[in-house]
Amino acid sequence: MMYSPICLTQDEFHPFIEALLPHVRAIAYTWFNLQARKRKYFKKHEKRMSKDEERAVKDELLSEKPEIKQKWASRLLAKLRKDIRQEYREDFVLTVTGKKHPCCVLSNPDQKGKIRRIDCLRQADKVWRLDLVMVILFKGIPLESTDGERLMKSPHCTNPALCVQPHHITVSVKELDLFLAYYVQEQDSGQSGSPSHNDPAKNPPGYLEDSFVKSGVFNVSELVRVSRTPITQGTGVNFPIGEIPSQPYYHDMNSGVNLQRSLSSPPSSKRPKTISIDENMEPSPTGDFYPSPSSPAAGSRTWHERDQDMSSPTTMKKPEKPLFSSASPQDSSPRLSTFPQHHHPGIPGVAHSVISTRTPPPPSPLPFPTQAILPPAPSSYFSHPTIRYPPHLNPQDTLKNYVPSYDPSSPQTSQSWYLG
C-alpha cells in the first residue's frame, strides 16, 4: 500500500484511521470548509458572499490537493475515535467497512448526558453534532449544522440519544423536499430535451420558476458526484479491499479471509508506530510528558489492546505518585528514579562543617532533586542498578584518601582548594 508522506505523521497513522479513510466521502472536505469560509467572510465584511465569490471558493476547495483532503480527514477521524466509546470502536470499523451487520455505536456523552459536538476544522468557530458529522462523512449528504432535528434513528437503535452509527441515522424528508425533488427533476428533463417534456400538460407551471431560488453553488450532478467519490481518490493511496490493514478485528472472523497489507518496505522491517503521541505520553505533575508504562511493548500490541488498558475515554491521565520524591529506591520508578538521600562521608575541613550544620532546603516545585550534588555513601552499588563503582575504587576506603586535606594555615592548600 502506497502512502503519501504528508499523511504518515505520528498523529494520523493509526489502524482505525487507515481502515475508515477510504470510506470518507470527498464532499465532506469541501462542505465543511465552505461553511467555515462563508462564516468567516460574513464576520469580516458583515455581509454574505456573492454567488461568484462562493462559487470561486467551492472550485478552489474541490481542486485542493488530495493529500491535503486526506490529512484533514485523518485528523477528523482521530477526533471521532476519541469520542466513540472504547468498547464500540471495533464494531464501528467493522460496520462502516461492511464486514459486520450494523449495530449501535455509542459515543461519549457531554456533561449534560447528550450527544457531543465537535469542531471539524482547526480553530473553527462552529461545532457539529457527532451524528451530523457521521452522515456527512460516510454518506456524503450535505447537511447544515442546524439540521440536527431532521435526523432520525433506526427502529433497531437501542440508544437513539448517543448512537452515532451511520447506518442507523436517516434524514427525514418533508413534503417540501419531495416537491423540490420533483421540480428539479422536471428542470433537468427539460434541459435534456426528453420527449416527455414536450407535452405541455406535463410542463411545470411557470410560476414555479419564480417561487424557488437556488441559494447554493452546487448543481445536482456535481453534488452526486462528490458525494459518491471517496476522499482518497486521486492520491497515491490505493485502498483495495484486500489491502486494508491486517488487524484481526478488521474482517469477519468467520469469513476466513486474511487481509494483508503490502508496504513498500521489506517484510522484515519494523512496522511504523501506530499510536498517537497523546496515547503514548503521560503528563507529570508539572505538565511534562514521559512514556507510559505500556510504551515499550507498544510495537507488538494492537490499538484495541492498548485501548483496553485505558479505564476512561480520555487518552491523558495523571500518574498516581509524583515522579521525584525522597522515598526509598524501591518506591521510586525504575525508569525515572533519582538518587535518594544518603549520609555523605565527612570531608575534612570547612566543607564538612558546612554540610553537617546546614538545614535542608524547602521542597522545590520544580521536578528536580534537591539533594546536595556530592558522591553518595560508600556501598557496593549505587541506587541505580546499572551504575557501579570503578574497579580500582575500594568501597570501604573513605574519600579522604583521594581528596587532599584542607589546612587553612597552609597557603598552598588554601590556594589549591579554591582554584579547584
UniProtKB/Swiss-Prot annotation:
GO terms for molecular function: DNA binding; DNA-binding transcription activator activity, RNA polymerase II-specific; DNA-binding transcription factor activity, RNA polymerase II-specific; RNA polymerase II cis-regulatory region sequence-specific DNA binding; sequence-specific double-stranded DNA binding; transcription regulator inhibitor activity. A motif (9aaTAD) lies at residues 397-405. PROSITE patterns: CTF_NFI_1, CTF_NFI_2. One of its GO terms (biological process) is glial cell proliferation. The modification Phosphoserine is found at S264, S292, S295, S312, S328, S333. Residues 325-340, 407-420 have a biased composition (Polar residues). It is found in: Nucleus. One of its GO terms (cellular component) is nucleoplasm. Belongs to the CTF/NF-I family. The 9aaTAD motif is a transactivation domain present in a large number of yeast and animal transcription factors. This is Nuclear factor 1 B-type.
